[in-house]
Curated annotation (Swiss-Prot):
InterPro entries given in the database record: Nucleotide-bd_a/b_plait_sf (IPR012677), Ribosomal_uL23-like (IPR013025), Ribosomal_uL23/eL15/eS24_sf (IPR012678)
GO biological process terms, semicolon-separated: translation
Coiled-coil residue windows: none
Record's function text: One of the early assembly proteins it binds 23S rRNA. One of the proteins that surrounds the polypeptide exit tunnel on the outside of the ribosome. Forms the main docking site for trigger factor binding to the ribosome.
Naturally occurring in which organism (per UniProt): Ruthia magnifica subsp. Calyptogena magnifica
Keywords: Ribonucleoprotein, Ribosomal protein, RNA-binding, rRNA-binding
Family: Belongs to the universal ribosomal protein uL23 family.
GO CC, alphabetical: ribonucleoprotein complex; ribosome
Subunit annotation: Part of the 50S ribosomal subunit. Contacts protein L29, and trigger factor when it is bound to the ribosome.
Record-annotated disulphide pairs: none
Protein name per the record: Large ribosomal subunit protein uL23
Keyword Phosphoprotein applies: no
Amino acid sequence: MNQEKILKILLAPIVSEKTTMLSAHNQYAFKVRVDCSKREIKAAVEMLFSVNVENVTTSIVKGKKKIFKGRIGSRPNWKKAMVKVSEGQMIDVSRT
């Protein structure tokens, strides 16, 4: 997998109260492209952060319905990836 494709897979880390608590258990959350697979996500995280990934779980988050100036619209769907790294390794999401 080339470097350019890897950089396009991971869009942003998800930083919330829940994901901060999960980081104590070596789990990290990322917003990823909707069309990427678990294998691609695993390869991207291992290459970018130099960690060993044990497990990747993904879910599609449905976009919310919003009203703007009386018109109903919707935000796009997006994919969330929960990545579990090996014991003793960590990812510094504040730098990403």
